[in-house]
Amino acid sequence: MKLLNRISLVAIATIALFSCSSSEDQFIGTWTNECEDEVMGLKILPQKELLTLNDDNSFVQSFTYFADSQYDTLAVVSVNGSWELVNNCLEMSYDTESIVVKCDDEDIIDIFYDNLLGNIALNNEELEKAHEEDSQYGIQNATVKDNSLISKENLEDEDGEVIYTKVN
């Protein structure tokens, strides 16, 4: 059954590669729906986007991402709680603001999705700490273990300590 599930997910991922949405499908927030978005070598492909508007004008966003990187990680995640992880991804936890996917690799990768701002971030402890302490800033960070960054803009607190690094 596990093998069948994996085959199905790979098939869906393949379909996603050839069915990228147009810019008209962008949702409320800052996320830009592009066919292929490279973030620190991690390819994130939006496979499905749903926006459900509730009676009280709140909304539920549902996103599924296929992430394929040098770590050979394929993660299938949905913000609304319907999720499944394959390959070496072990667990996922989420709340109303973020998703954390922890992958069993020599480098632990956490994928944070800010449900309010629509930002993807890759990091581990420091980013998680920044999110816990200053969630008002959202998550706009991308680093890997060797701290190599594409281009960055630091947000510092009043003491000069870097709260997070925005990757452009």
Put a short name on every predicted segment:
Residues 20-168:
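Lipid interaction determinants
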Residues 1-18:
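Sec-dependent bacterial lipoprotein signal peptides
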